[in-house]
Amino acid sequence: MKNRTIYITDFDLKRLREMILTWRRSDFSRRNDLEELEEELNRGLLVNPHNVPENVITMNSTTCLMDLDTGEELIYTLVFPKDADIQQNKISILAPIGTAMLGYSVGDTFEWKVPDGIRRLKVKGLLYQPEASGHYHL
């Protein structure tokens, strides 16, 4: 939900802004994805990686989500585009679901547009968050 506060670490913000600049120069077909991500970054509450709540989805976090329409549980790791691999459930931050989940907390519900409507997911749990594990530079 767009009005919910999301958290973004200053380390993730720096890397994501650099990535946006690089992609803007090289791949115009991703313009809409980049704009969506930038919109999310602009509304996020900036936090130090050492102070981010341990229940927040940050870059390289692995999370358990529930599709509120189907009841299906999904496990995804949120990654940078170069590391994306759907076979390993690694979702790019530039994928609509990746942009949508960044910064949300366990218990939150978020949604994003798909060709046939809107999907709604609930964050059921975090299986791994780099910052909570002391991995501040992943």
Cite the ranges covered by each PLM segment.
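Long amphipathic N-terminal alpha/beta scaffold segment
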Residues: 36-82
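Surface-exposed strand-loop junctions at beta-sheet edges and helix termini
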Residues: 104, 128-129
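Short, solvent-exposed secondary-structure boundary/capping segments
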Residues: 87-90, 131-138
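Residue-level marker of positions within ordered structural domains that often coincide
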Residues: 21, 68, 128
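N-terminal intrinsically disordered, low-complexity, charge/repeat-rich segments that act as generic
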Residues: 1-53
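Residues that recognize and position ribonucleotide moieties
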Residues: 6, 56, 119
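Conserved hydrophobic positions within beta-strands
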Residues: 123-126
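Non-DNA-binding regulatory cores of transcription-related proteins
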Residues: 62, 72-118
